């Protein structure tokens, strides 16, 4: 699930989109059944991340996910930022843990806000913003939105549903990066997300 500014973000980022599922009994039941099936997986990026965060009550293992609020800068932030992929159950990031990679960010409401420190500690983080020393940070501009502990990607306890505010799909080839040591015609490390998804299909 991707997209951008669904319903104009009038009700809050992703809320209108999520509400179109939550308040339609037929669609809500269908979605609940989908997430309950063990042979499905889902990736939510940016507006898809915000939408799925609103649907967390329907997603097994997502009870510790945060809300996504307006950026601390009160501005739309669009540029490359540096993230670290942290150990998690996510099927999408298998084999990528420990990588520090540039990634495109393009959002106005990407600040992950947890209800409590305990909720943040219990959440299964997937990626976080880091500074030029590789340390998780809440400091601007390394962290473009001010997310708690730099967290900007999460997954469920079983790793089948993953959400993230950054856009790895906008940087899966080196040609999409601002600079690279690699051949610009080659896939970047972000391509591993899609290889992992393909393997999950079988």
PLM features: what roles do these ranges have?
Residues 1-2:
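A structural preference for short, pocket-lining loop segments at secondary-structure junctions
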């Amino acid at each position: 699930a991707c997209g951008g500014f669904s319903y104009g973000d009038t009700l809050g980022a992703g809320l209108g989109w999520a509400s179109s599922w939550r308040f339609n009994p037929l669609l809500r039941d269908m979605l609940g059944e989908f997430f309950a099936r063990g042979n499905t997986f889902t990736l939510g990026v940016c507006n898809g991340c915000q939408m799925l965060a609103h649907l967390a009550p329907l997603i097994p293992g997502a009870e510790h996910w945060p809300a996504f609020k307006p950026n601390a800068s009160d501005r739309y932030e669009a540029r490359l930022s540096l993230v670290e992929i942290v150990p998690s159950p996510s099927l999408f990031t298998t084999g990528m843990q420990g990588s520090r990679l540039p990634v495109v960010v393009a959002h106005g409401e990407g600040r992950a806000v947890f209800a409590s420190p305990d909720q943040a500690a219990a959440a299964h983080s997937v990626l976080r913003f880091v500074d030029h020393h590789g340390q998780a940070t809440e400091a601007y501009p390394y962290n473009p939105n001010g997310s708690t502990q730099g967290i900007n990607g999460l997954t469920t306890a079983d790793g089948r549903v993953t959400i993230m505010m950054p856009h790895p799909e906008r940087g899966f080839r080196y040609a999409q990066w601002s600079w690279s040591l690699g051949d610009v015609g080659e896939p970047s490390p972000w391509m591993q997300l899609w290889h992992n998804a393909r393997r999950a299909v079988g």
